Amino acid sequence: SMTAAKLQHIPQLVRQQYVAAIEAGDAFFFESDVRIVRGQNVQRPVPWQIRIVPALLKKPKAPVSAEEEVRPKQNQVDVFAPPYVPNLLVKELDDFTVLLNKYCVLPHHYLLVTRDFVSQEKPPSPSMLALVYSMITSHTPSSDGAELLGFFNCGPNSGASQPHCHFQLVELTPSENATKAVPIEHMLDTQSAPDEDKEEILGLAVPWRHFVARLEPPSDPEKLENYFGKRFSHLLEAMFSLALEKNDENKGL
């Protein structure tokens, strides 16, 4: 298993590589605005944060110069497979690689990708979940209180633009007028009592199916993989059982 000491250096490496990649033109940052939107006619509305990125409407294409022609290029068949662009490569781990995201809406946006090709339409493996959890818990919040958020878009319908398995990690700070960096935490605070059964899967009161598993992982890193495999399977069971109950052709999504 990956030691916490090795993982603690990743945010620092990400920052160094990010500066180098932006300066070299191997990564791109797009300015954005955040709007806070609160639900109408609901108790305790969640302050949803909607990020608007006008530049993504039309990504500019610069004319190809002689310098561009010799620039290291991503693998055209699979951008998350070797050979990696040196400025986008943060760290190679055993079965995974840490890469910078080429197109950033938030600074220091990076990815954990499988070394070998695995489809993004498959759920993340227990080993990947355990590693992401370890990366998040070994992350030291910066002076502005930024927290590390990991998210996984499972296939094109949920926003994944690449077919190679990847988990995304970003640093988030609470937006103006918001007390939490992750809006859904407001619902967790109001929907779960401290003494509730920690094994229970929570279904959140939103207009889509959203299930939450609270975590109390074992302190032994060797047992993390098994723990996350079980908790994730409980989430999937909750999703599919509700889909069956509703006779849902979309499998609960």
Q: Which residues fall in each region the model found?
A:
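Active-site microenvironments that recognize anionic phosphate/pyrophosphate groups
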Residues: 1-124, 174, 178-229, 233-253
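Solvent-exposed loop and beta-edge segments used for protein-protein assembly and interaction
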Residues: 42-44, 144, 161
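Short, well-ordered alpha-helical segments in soluble proteins
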Residues: 78-80, 136-143, 171, 191
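Generic beta-strand structural signal
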Residues: 94-96, 108-109, 146-150, 161-167
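Short N-terminal edge-element motif at the start of the domain
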Residues: 108-149
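Histidine-centered divalent-metal-coordination microenvironment in nucleic-acid enzymes
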Residues: 151-179
